[in-house]
Swiss-Prot record:
InterPro entries per UniProt: DALR_anticod-bd, Gly-tRNA-synth_bsu, Gly-tRNA-synth_heterodimer
Pfam families found in the cross-reference section: DALR_1, tRNA_synt_2f
Gene this protein is translated from: glyS
Lineage: Bacteria, Pseudomonadati, Aquificota, Aquificia, Aquificales
Reactions performed catalytically: tRNA(Gly) + glycine + ATP = glycyl-tRNA(Gly) + AMP + diphosphate
Protein name: Glycine--tRNA ligase beta subunit
GO biological process: arginyl-tRNA aminoacylation; glycyl-tRNA aminoacylation
Length: 664
């Protein structure tokens, strides 16, 4: 079990975003063959490295059963082999002595049982290595040889493979593995030999490559901390920038630069976005205001020339941004609204102007629920997409919403209206905040509801991992808003705006799957129980009911409630629809008592299924003393309807038939 394997796939510079996902995929795929106890990955822009230790590599013996024809086909009435059996033996190069008669579900069959020696895990890897590399799910793949078959995210230039200190022969196209790697593109010359996996990190560091992602990240974070102290502020940069920059360099060198204070006229988020978007620079702030400093991370040893180059390129970007900003401020946002008729939302859905028309109808339905000021909401709806026509957003589309807020505020629009223009895109993820203002909440919901309805009606439905229009994000955004804001919203109310369309059931199922994902921390049976009763189009009811049912499930009394509910459910025909109970037909005392108790509970506002526990006594008494399936059809149907009413009471909280009670 002391076997160890090191594989390094050397490439041209990989996009930062593909490195970690590719390593995760390769790790899982290769370790499914090796089953190693220790696994470690390393990744830089020029290499994907995997290390496996402590795995078995024996060739294992196993029995292989080759099934033949049924016994009565293989032998005649006298027990002699038939032509069918002879053909089976010839095909498998076997003798009559090897034949066994074994039982299957459909009777007795002849079979040949042989001992087979399986390939070792390493042999399997050698056999499957090329296919594994070809199966890595990159967003885009490229070819660099005459072979149309060999593709990867970027050209593969070398493969290092060591198994227990010896070169392991692996192939990818015409490329063969060796014990050679390469150091830093600029700071190291020629091949680097690795003879022992234990020397891998140390040797690469000597050649200006830090293969460990976390170590490079820590160097960048320390550089940010040191630079913050130097400039007297703290770092200010978009989420994910540290991780992205970490995968852009093999050896991080910090470069602290400065820009002209005149650019601080720009809104802070514009500066940090320009710096991060174009150059992957980090900015700094103090007391909520940006400082005119930035930190760049170079993949080469820093000098004054590199610093000046960084400052020059950022200055050019900020100069452009300042020009766009000043030009945009000259245009009243309202004057841009008619221009939205020329901005296509989607060929099958219409223009942005048409989208705002639909959003206004949605907002009108939402307004009473949130007690909004309609004039504010209406103004926000019609201003919501105009910043798409500004020069700043054309250049940096990630600033949409924010620039609407900035320009609206600068032009004297109502503060809540201005803020709503930014909040319409909240939350951008499940971790992101929801809108604070009422107007922003309505605008955000209107935008996301329209996205779902419009694209599903157009047949533009997410498939697999593909979601080009961010519909999963829209759905999660709606779910989180109604959850955080406690909005008892029925999304089906907006269907009339879009009319009938055949994809509507797919929209309902789509929301159901998003709710299941949102509620993944809760037991599956409880989530399923609620979704069997409440429509996914009522996300607040679903979420609230799951939480109520889950809290109740912690009680020692909960199994008794479930038992009572299931006892009722089991006896009711699945297609039973009648809830009407004729009191005159209740001839037994136990059924009269159950009916009386039932009506008491039906008139209560129940907050927990545990409140139904007292009903169990009457349910048990009913089943012990009353014959449900009475010979008289009217009496029988009346009793079933009574039980249907009882079941319906339990269904206030979910379908108890789905609840699994764990013993002990």
């Amino acid at each position: 079990m002391t076997n160890e394997l090191l594989i390094e796939i050397g490439t041209e510079e990989l996009p930062a975003g593909v490195i970690n996902p590719a390593l995760d995929y390769l790790k899982d795929k290769i370790n499914s063959l090796l089953n190693a106890r220790q696994v470690k990955t390393y990744g830089t822009p020029r290499r994907l490295t995997l290390y496996f230790k402590d795995f078995e590599n024996e060739r294992k013996e196993k029995k292989e059963v080759i099934w033949g024809p049924p016994k009565n086909v293989a032998y005649d009435e006298k027990g002699n082999p038939t032509k069918a059996l002879e053909g089976f033996l010839k095909k498998n190069n076997a003798s009559l002595e090897e034949v066994k008669v074994l039982k299957k579900d459909k009777g007795e069959y002849v079979a040949i049982v042989r001992k087979v020696i399986e390939k070792s895990p390493i042999e399997k890897l050698q056999e499957e290595f090329e296919e594994i590399l070809l199966s890595v799910p990159f967003p885009k793949r490229m070819r660099w040889t005459s072979s149309k078959r060999i593709t990867f995210s970027r050209p593969v230039r070398w493969i290092l493979a060591l198994f227990n200190g010896q070169v392991l022969k692996l192939r990818f196209g015409e490329l063969e593995s060796s014990n050679k790697t390469y150091g830093h593109r600029f700071l190291s010359k020629g091949e680097v030999t690795i003879n022992n996996p234990a020397d891998y990190e140390k040797t690469l560091k000597e050649h200006y490559v830090i293969p460990d992602f976390n170590e490079r990240k820590e160097i960048i974070l320390r550089a940010l901390e040191k630079s913050s102290q130097e400039v007297g502020g703290k770092p200010s940069y978009p989420e994910g920038l540290v991780e992205e920059v970490t995968n852009l360099v093999e050896y991080p060198f910090p470069v602290l630069g400065k820009f002209d204070e005149k650019y601080l006229e720009l809104p802070p988020l514009v500066i940090t976005t320009v710096a991060a978007h174009h150059q992957r620079f980090f900015c700094f702030e103090k007391d909520g205001k940006l400082l005119n400093y930035f930190l760049g991370i170079s993949n080469n040893k820093p000098n004054e020339k590199i610093k000046e180059g960084y400052e020059k390129v950022l200055r050019a970007r900020l100069e452009d941004a300042l020009f766009f900003y000043r030009e945009d401020l000259k245009k009243d946002l309202k004057s841009l609204i008619p221009e939205l008729k020329k901005v296509l939302f989607h060929p099958k859905v219409g223009s942005m102007y048409e989208k705002e028309e639909r959003m206004e109808k949605i907002a009108q339905k939402l307004c009473p629920l949130l007690k909004c000021e309609w004039e504010k909401v209406k103004e926000a709806v019609w201003l919501s997409k105009v910043d798409l026509l500004t020069e700043m957003v054309k250049e940096l589309d990630e600033l949409q919403g924010y620039m609407g807020y900035v320009y609206a505020k600068a032009q004297g629009y109502d503060e809540e209206v201005a803020k709503a223009l930014w909040e319409q895109y909240f939350p951008r993820s499940l971790e992101d905040k929801v809108p604070e203002t009422t107007t922003g909440t309505i605008l955000s919901l209107s935008d996301k509801i329209d996205n779902l309805y419009s694209f599903f009606k157009a047949g533009e439905i997410p498939k697999g991992s593909s979601d080009p229009y961010g519909l999963r994000r829209s759905a999660f955004g709606i779910i989180k808003i109604v959850d955080v804001k406690n909005l008892d919203l029925n999304l089906e109310d907006f269907k009339e705006i879009y009319g009938e369309f055949k994809q509507y059931p797919k929209l309902v199922e789509f929301l159901k799957q998003r709710l299941i994902s949102y509620l993944e921390d809760y037991p599956v049976d409880i989530v399923r129980a609620v979704l069997n009763v409440y429509s996914p189009m009522e996300p607040y009811k679903v979420i609230n009911s799951v939480r109520v049912l889950y809290e109740a499930s912690k009680s020692p009394e909960f199994p008794s409630v479930v038992e009572a509910a299931k006892r009722v459910i089991r006896i009711i025909p699945k297609d039973w629809k009648n809830y009407e109970v004729d009191e005159k037909l209740l001839s037994e005392e136990a059924e009269r008592e159950l009916y009386q108790k039932l009506t008491e509970f039906e008139n209560k506002e129940l907050k927990s299924p545990l409140e139904l526990l007292p009903l169990k006594e009457y349910i048990d008494k009913f089943f012990d003393n009353v014959k449900v399936m009475a010979e008289d059809e009217k009496i029988r149907n009346n009793r079933i309807s009574l039980l249907k009413r009882v079941e319906n009471l339990f269904r206030t909280f979910g379908d108890f038939n789905e609840i699994v009670i764990k013993e002990g």
